[in-house]
Curated annotation (Swiss-Prot):
The lineage of its organism: Bacteria, Bacillati, Bacillota, Bacilli, Bacillales. HAMAP family: MinC (MF_00267). This is Probable septum site-determining protein MinC. Belongs to the MinC family. InterPro entries: CAP/MinC_C (IPR016098), MinC (IPR013033), MinC_C_sf (IPR036145), MinC_N_1 (IPR055219), Septum_form_inhib_MinC_C (IPR005526). The gene is minC. It holds the Pfam family MinC_N_1. Interacts with MinD and FtsZ. Keywords: Cell cycle, Cell division, Septation. SUPFAM superfamilies: Cell-division inhibitor MinC, C-terminal domain. GO terms for biological process: cell morphogenesis; division septum assembly; regulation of cell septum assembly.
Length: 228
């Protein structure tokens, strides 16, 4: 009995076009040959008037930029096919390091004094105060276990879901992504309590009770593992 040939390329039609699942165990040259054969069989060159979007998934295979371009060129040569995306489950070491820096919690114990700027790529956990004139900046969230009386900028790289939380919230300015808020009104003596700031549905920064944070941003509970 003849052994059934392993299928290295699987084509699935979707409402958005077609998805190509490419095997991650065979050689790249074998993959290209079978991909060309499959596309030639299932999709003819046609007149090129109706473009079909192609989503390519390569599993646990790392593709260089040159290899990605080879796949794009092969598919593009079918005239009515255009590559929308090529997705791999594998990332480079540089990408992994960048992801870690952007998502980790950086604990720092200090007082940020006037004129000083503290900047981290990920989430900042500051154990200490931010004095008037001091600035803290984070690519993610900012948590201040102390008094925030200076400037805080969370979501520095464009994350509008970032939040700012402090034991005592009395800042000169709050900024989340590209949205800014001037200092809120002075609180009455003894009225200071832990608060959080976030961007609401109207794209305005709102300062509210810290207890609301888990409801507003439920994914923040995943960060607990980085703290404890």
């Amino acid at each position: 009995m003849e052994e059934k040939k392993q299928q290295n390329v699987t084509i699935k039609g979707t409402k958005d076009g077609i998805t190509l699942h490419l095997d991650d165990c065979c050689s790249f040259s074998e993959l290209l040959i079978e991909l060309d054969e499959k596309l030639s069989t299932h999709y003819y060159d046609g007149d090129g008037r109706s473009l079909i979007e192609v989503h390519v998934k390569v599993g646990n295979r790392y593709l260089t930029e040159v290899q990605q371009e080879e796949i794009r060129t092969l598919i593009r040569n079918k005239k009515n096919l255009v590559v929308d995306s090529i997705k791999s489950d594998v990332i480079t070491k540089a990408e992994a390091i960048a992801w870690k820096e952007e998502t980790e919690i950086v604990p720092i114990s200090k007082i940020v004094r006037s004129g000083q700027v503290l900047h981290v790529k990920g989430n900042l956990l500051l154990i200490g105060d931010v004095n008037p004139g001091g600035t803290v900046i984070a690519g993610g969230n900012i948590f201040v276990v102390g008094s925030l009386r200076g400037i805080a900028h969370a979501g520095y790289y464009g994350d509008s879901d970032a939040v700012i939380a402090a034991s005592v919230m009395n800042p000169m300015q709050l900024r989340i992504s590209d949205v800014a808020m001037r200092a809120p009104e002075e609180k009455e003596d003894g009225a200071e309590a832990a608060e959080c700031a976030y961007i609401n549905e109207n794209n305005h920064i709102v300062v509210d009770r810290l207890q609301l944070l888990t409801h507003l941003r439920p994914n923040l509970t995943k960060l607990e593992r980085g703290i404890v």
